[in-house]
Regions:
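Conserved Class I S-adenosyl-L-methionine-dependent methyltransferase catalytic core
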Residues: 1-6, 10-11, 16, 25, ...
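Alpha-helical subdomain
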Residues: 1-42, 47-48, 135, 140, ...
Length: 309
């Protein structure tokens, strides 16, 4: 995290820089520089050749701030998670997050950080979704709680005739529009300022995507989201839900299991739902589940495709 926060990968890039120059530019002495660079080399983030260090392709793609797929802010998320995780016992005993929440039950992160920190990850997941589930015949998709618009961007890139509308709060959509414009898709992706619990959702879409959102809420609130989305779609409309889902017996994998604890620390009522739980809620909202697939071995993310009755 320190290497990302200090801008090591932005500084050296794939072109490289002598270690001494990099240390000087970073403003750190030779001993801590050696420890930092050695660790980055050992973990596969930097390459060292004759006293010159450079970013590996993976580090350049995911840790440089100017990369479309940058996970830089995702890594820096740890700065804001540490205070909450340090009070884990309190959260477990009280069944409530130890840090302040906003009116919708979200952990209060600095706004400028929150709007960007998942974009690179969501873009990669959206591309996997586009490769896995065909949106043939879909004309307009509603991206519910779409954040930066990354999933809509990925889907529209993969489906040239598809249009999308990102539904989220206006304070989020300010940044969403920047990402859409940067992607050159302003003519195909629009935004809609709406609270999914209280406002009217678009009724001109024949598909909806709910990506990495339901886990922020309790079973009751997640079911309410699904019901409101169902009410806005026509009969036969497509629903795709993406979630980090543990096995049905909750015995693994490790990441989804730990993710539930993350929700306990950071949300009021949030939990990682199993595939069976997701399917049950989706069917109760008025859909027929058609299939579920795992998106990528590393991400342990489930995509469930359903059709409105």
């Amino acid at each position: 995290m320190a290497a990302v926060e200090m801008g090591v990968f932005d500084l050296v890039g794939t072109e490289g820089m002598p270690e001494a120059d990099a240390a000087s530019r970073l403003g750190i002495a030779s001993r801590p520089a050696r420890g930092l660079f050695d660790t980055c080399v050992a973990t596969g983030l930097l390459l060292r050749e004759g006293g010159t260090i450079r970013s590996t392709p993976a580090a350049a793609k995911y840790l440089a701030s100017d990369s479309e797929y940058s996970l830089r802010n995702y890594v820096l998320d740890e700065r804001w998670c540490w205070p909450a995780w340090g009070r884990l016992e309190e959260a477990l005993r009280s069944d409530a997050p130890p840090l302040p929440q906003d009116d919708d039950g979200y952990h209060v992160f600095p706004e400028e950080f929150l709007l960007d920190f998942l974009h690179g990850h969501s873009l990669a997941m959206g591309e996997l979704l586009a490769e896995t589930i065909a949106f043939d015949g879909v004309t307009r998709v509603m991206d519910v709680g779409g954040g930066s618009g990354a999933v809509s961007i990925a889907l529209c890139r993969a489906n040239p005739s598809l249009q999308a509308v990102v539904v989220d709060r206006e304070e989020v959509l300010v940044k969403t529009r920047e990402h859409i414009e940067r992607a050159g898709l302003s003519d195909r992706i629009s935004t809609r300022n709406a609270n999914v619990f209280t406002d009217t959702l678009p009724d001109d879409c024949d598909a909806a995507v709910i990506a990495s959102m339901l886990h922020d809420f309790s079973v009751e609130r997640a079911a309410e989201i699904l019901s409101r989305v169902a009410a806005s779609l026509p009969s036969g409309g497509t629903l795709v839900v993406m979630e980090i889902a543990p096995d049905d017996d909750r015995g693994g994998p490790v990441l989804p299991a730990v993710f539930t604890v993350t929700m306990i620390v950071n949300t009021e009522g949030g939990i990682a739902f199993t595939r069976a739980e997701l399917k049950e809620m989706i069917e109760a909202a008025g859909f027929e589940v058609e299939r579920d697939v795992t998106l990528g071995e590393r991400y342990v993310t489930t995509a469930i495709e359903a059709r409105k009755r």
